[in-house]
């Protein structure tokens, strides 16, 4: 009976923290990490999110962008898609927290990169785009968006890259990866140091201090992003490119 209880806790830890994920799907502590691990995971306040290992180091990112004109950033910068179109099925948010039009998340070090400050208590994220945890549902809409809209053709869309990724070995046999919502992406940023340490421990690609795309929408011309340089959460035009890192929920 003791062995059974240990296995269950080993399979799905209940303590808040960042873990690495083995090939069999087990979550294990960072101290047991090696390059055979397929992903990292964060558990916090009831949310369990698996974070993809390699981002644009994946062959699928290159495949998805192979038909585009050569540019230095075409394999890691992507459109949200269909600039000028309001996507039915994705809720629009015009505030970060129900009050402010932008804000700054608390860094794992304990400081903020600017004001206004966003509460570190994610249970208080009950309004505005931070209340959006529906990345999987949002992504089902974005998977159907394969053009930038109008004359915007410099980048692939995040949905197109996701489709290509899911159809490739890069998905590690999982078919439920998706583009994180703003709430999910914000949670990752708040644990960025630990997440990047875990990615390094499994020879993965660290999240960079750049613009990261969420699946949350602002209006027909804008979507929500998190700037991983300073934790700023704000809107960005759909015709501009951003990085994307796929995630999946752990049941």
Predicted regions and their residues:
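C-terminal, surface-exposed recognition/capping segments
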Residues: 155, 164, 174-175, 182-251
